[in-house]
Amino acid sequence: MLKLSMNTESLPSLNDKTLGWLTFLHRKVSINDDWSEDGEPLDWWDKTSNPPVLNFARFDLSESSYALGLMADVTPAWREVYAFILKGLSERHLTFWAAYDWLTQIGPDPNRGKYPQEWIDLWIPDHLVGKYDTPGWVANGIEPWGLQKDPIGADGNLFFKGWLNLIQSLHVYTTGEDTWGSSFQVAGVDRSKFDWTQHRLVEHLSSQWTKNRMGPHCENTKIWPYCLSAAGLGLQLYDAIFQKNTHSVYPEWVEHTKDKYYGFDSSGALEWTPIYYDPLIDHIHAAGPSNGLTIAFYMMPQDPIFAEFLYRTAVKKLGWDNINKEIKMKPEPRFMALGLACAKEFGDTTVEMRLRAFAEEHFEPRWFGENNINFGYWFNLNEKWPRGQWAALAMMAEVGKSGAWSNLFRNPNLEKFNAPSLEGVDFPNILVEQAFNDPNSQTLHIKLKVANKSKENSPSKIFIKKIPDLSAVKVKRDGYLYDMWKATGKSSIEIDISYSDMKLEIYTGWSGAKKRGEFNKVIKKDNLTSIGAGIMQRPQSLKIINTSSCPCCSSIGN
């Protein structure tokens, strides 16, 4: 039999670590744990990292969603598992435990006078020690807002509604279906329930942002540029999918607040970056320039010029670009993982390679689970499961190429919804490394890998849907013509396969619609914010922290 040549090495594919992480996320959402008032999330959901600000299970939901969006762009012809996981993440984000802080932290923190000195130094304005709530305490019910039972409808709680929309938008990006356009219920205070749709949520969020030019707040009284930049990503992807224009609030907000939220010297060099802003007391809580790295990660698809400025300044301060300077572990890995993701995104090969080598040595990458099918980063914590939030961020550097994160939001692939797609894979027994339609050759390229060796060589089947012309279909397996398939409808076929590693080429006749999302237009510089532009009145109160333990910042003197 003549073997036909096939070169798929240049096509995008998922590496082993990514597939191992994907199987673990699939495992996490496949178990129906109880996130209601009467239950508790299973302990593999991370509600431990970075107290008092991020030690809530919903941040595991949001951080776990990012790499799935990237995976959907690597294998756009196979998305069923990403959709399943993102649906599970979205559903959990509507529950009591997702909104735990807003539903239980009522009024001022009764322990505000007992904070450890470390928290005081890190989080509290100097003139309000003992009289001010730490970040992480939402203070639902305080004036001027009063008790607001709805975690979405509230004036505050930006970090809840902003990340919820981002996860839901990523879910829709994998399915092409307006799932969250139908009414869903979100848990409220005292077991109340509130009906929302994603479209109403976005309208509410963008309206709040328009009315408050400094930005909606997270905890009552505290506005976080970090969280607002994540919320902006959700609006950006939502607009691209639904052809809306809600994201315009983000560049306007950056331009309006830049000279209040960031400190520049007379030469325009960055001196400090914001952690949070309290408009009631006009107080900026800030850190050194390297803190800007955490904002840059979320900002770069939205304002790449200023985001890269923040990134380059942080890298310079940290010495990561100096091959003669040793990279040292920060107090926790979140900052390092974000740095690695940013370095890859900006194509900073020197920093990427240095941080990647550092992660391999210090993040404790490990395979686990039955047949070692799962992968995660364990961070030498000696815990039962990989630390969810940190591991999810560390995985960002494993998926896609340089620029993939920005491309997901600025140039989303919407033509995939009308292209031939692979479905019915027995995941996780069979893993999909590659599923990509090449419009030039009009061929769907698939690469499968058997994960469950106990099923090896036993029969299975897969389905190819949305084929434009069944009469033109030809199938090759590992380079040879293959006839173990049949039509199952006007635009679909069923292929008999086995539990074994294989490459499939399916000629479908699909040449591509050659249409991308609304954001495929070139982002002009006059649509982006400039560095150090404009003058805004400085805050009445400013505290620049100097610490080695900030969960979103870096080390002393940076």
Each model region followed by its residue ranges:
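Terminal, non-catalytic domain-edge segments
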Residues: 1-45, 49, 56-58, 65, ...
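Hydrophobic core segments within long, regular secondary-structure runs in both alpha-
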Residues: 11, 15-26, 65, 79-97, ...
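Extended HEAT/HEAT-like alpha-solenoid repeat tracts in very large eukaryotic scaffold/adaptor proteins
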Residues: 60, 64, 150-164, 227, ...
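Extended ligand-binding groove/face enriched in aromatic
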Residues: 76-222, 229, 268-271
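Boundary/linker segments of alpha-helical solenoid repeat arrays
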Residues: 92-103, 261-268, 322-323, 364-372
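Extended ligand-binding clefts on enzyme/binding-domain cores
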Residues: 189-200, 211-334
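Short beta-strands within extracellular/lumenal beta-sheet-rich domains
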Residues: 443-445, 542, 556-558
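Predominantly extracellular/luminal regions of secreted and cell-surface proteins
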Residues: 524-547
